[in-house]
Amino acid sequence: MPKTLHEIPRERPATPLLDRASSPAELRRLGEADLETLADELRQYLLYTVGQTGGHFGAGLGVVELTIALHYVFDTPDDRLVWDVGHQAYPHKILTERRELMGTLRQKDGLAAFPRRAESEYDTFGVGHSSTSISAALGMAIAARLQGKERKSVAVIGDGALTAGMAFEALNHASEVDADMLVILNDNDMSISHNVGGLSNYLAKILSSRTYSSMREGSKKVLSRLPGAWEIARRTEEYAKGMLVPGTLFEELGWNYIGPIDGHDLPTLVATLRNMRDMKGPQFLHVVTKKGKGFAPAELDPIGYHAITKLEAPGSAPKKTGGPKYSSVFGQWLCDMAAQDARLLGITPAMKEGSDLVAFSERYPERYFDVAIAEQHAVTLAAGMACEGMKPVVAIYSTFLQRAYDQLIHDVAVQHLDVLFAIDRAGLVGEDGPTHAGSFDISYLRCIPGMLVMTPSDEDELRKLLTTGYLFDGPAAVRYPRGSGPNHPIDPDLQPVEIGKGVVRRRGGKVALLVFGVQLAEAMKVAEGLDATVADMRFVKPLDEALVRELAGSHELLVSIEENAVMGGAGSAVGEFLAREGLEVPLLQLGLPDYYVEHAKPSEMLAECGLDAAGIEKAVRQRLDRQ
């Protein structure tokens, strides 16, 4: 059994066996008797490295044995291994020639937080969002068949990710094309199966054995010649398995279901995977693991230890903190507004903690809806609620709202329904990298007719603009970033602002900075040196055209600033207005460039994009020099 640790090691642990398994090829040269010791060493090393860098924590600890077994049995990278989401991929990175690079995890120019094709040939598919693995692995399996190659395709997906419709679409299609592939359900929440023991492991060995598989295929060939006989036999087998194992749903979808088995039992994992490797058609293995396995605090609190920050050196000064987190301001606003309006309903696609809906869910459980990883459903659910006079608020990360764009337009906006979108993690998100960045929401929202799009500059504005959007007659969106605000005093009253009106924060000379969002603080830092006017625009749509017209008539240069893609963003809205009205004033658009900004500290990412104070000042001075 895996050893259980109670503290994260600060010193690098001795890992003599892991040192001999830097690649899957080296791993496969070890004896099976060595694998359990290897698992203990890998878990200790994982604890140590994540303690040094911070990062996703519990999921990786839970798949140590599964990761070892997969690379031990399958011929990776020739066999294709696809991890869903990627939270659990750190052990995979350690075993695939990146152990000595783990100290650079999530740092600028270092290892990414998720599997990346550009990083390693063992990362067969780039991930970050959930529920994509089965579709990707199926595509690889079909390609292998068409290319005449014998390689295997394996997808590892969690029970949470399996709630998304995309996963079931792929399961259904795979059975239709009779794909030779293996899906492994990593059930680390016990949400599907609650009992795993000797009987389940024993049955898995039998049902995945070559003898059973050969007998099954032979019987199929014989009985298929007799009308109705094979169907009767198939149903009999299905019912018998259904009495003992919980895989009826997957059997009905056309998959050969094996499990559940103990995901921390290496001998059983290796034996079962070896058997299933050679089986034809769509195979489904149900593995039960414990999130945070081997680290006692994470086992007791898997949500709290989903990810951790790096350990601080003993005696180091406490980090300076800013104001409250923007998500916390939203969470408090939601509770306050719910107390005033019984029609308010809160919806989240599996982001209760991240979006700060915990307090709301406890105070108003009957008005709180966690729809799991189902963004499309979340948006249309809100639309249905709005049809009946309710006031739904969808709390969702910017990057995940992309997955429900059709529902946003077709089900909400076209019908002009009262749905408020509280869009968290807008802009750059730091160490999680481009898959989690909210780089495009202004661009994809401002083109939707009737949509109210707002960009608060601080905590107080966030609260006011949430109220404004909530009271608006139609669909509204408020975007706000990850992290803390500048500690601006917050008005406790639920007061809206006038729609489509920005605020001039400073009057200056020939340059006007038009700020959409939290870069206001950076703009104010350089305003005096540039003698610039600073406008807190607040609204992307409707744009404060009167303010833009005024500033265009009294300044020699307008500069739009936003933490969104320049292409199609708020600056584009300003440029379109200037062109439409024939206002001949130069416009400099500052925002996110036309490439994916790689993972780094948020400050490093903003500096790269020229959105910190120094970058803004440099860009403005260079433009003035050319005029």
From Swiss-Prot:
Catalysed transformations (reactions): D-glyceraldehyde 3-phosphate + pyruvate + H(+) = 1-deoxy-D-xylulose 5-phosphate + CO2
The entry's keywords: Isoprene biosynthesis, Magnesium, Metal-binding, Thiamine biosynthesis, Thiamine pyrophosphate, Transferase
Any one of the GO CC terms: cytosol
UniProt keyword Transmembrane present: no
SMART domains in the record: Transket_pyr (SM00861)
Binding residue positions for thiamine diphosphate: H87, G128, H129, S130, G160, A161, N188, F295, E375
One GO BP annotation of this record: isopentenyl diphosphate biosynthetic process, methylerythritol 4-phosphate pathway
Keyword Cell cycle among UniProt keywords: no
MF terms (GO), sorted A to Z: 1-deoxy-D-xylulose-5-phosphate synthase activity; magnesium ion binding; thiamine pyrophosphate binding
Entry cofactors: Mg(2+); thiamine diphosphate
Binding positions for Mg(2+) per the UniProt entry: D159, N188
Enzyme Commission (EC) number: 2.2.1.7
Pathway in which this enzyme or protein is active: Metabolic intermediate biosynthesis; 1-deoxy-D-xylulose 5-phosphate biosynthesis; 1-deoxy-D-xylulose 5-phosphate from D-glyceraldehyde 3-phosphate and pyruvate: step 1/1
CDD domains the record matches: TPP_DXS, TPP_PYR_DXS_TK_like
Cofactor-binding details, from the entry: Binds 1 Mg(2+) ion per subunit. Binds 1 thiamine pyrophosphate per subunit.
Pfam families assigned: DXP_synthase_N, Transket_pyr, Transketolase_C
Function text: Catalyzes the acyloin condensation reaction between C atoms 2 and 3 of pyruvate and glyceraldehyde 3-phosphate to yield 1-deoxy-D-xylulose-5-phosphate (DXP).
Protein family (similarity comment): Belongs to the transketolase family. DXPS subfamily.
Assembly and binders: Homodimer.
Protein name, entry field: 1-deoxy-D-xylulose-5-phosphate synthase
Taxonomic lineage: Bacteria, Pseudomonadati, Pseudomonadota, Gammaproteobacteria, Pseudomonadales
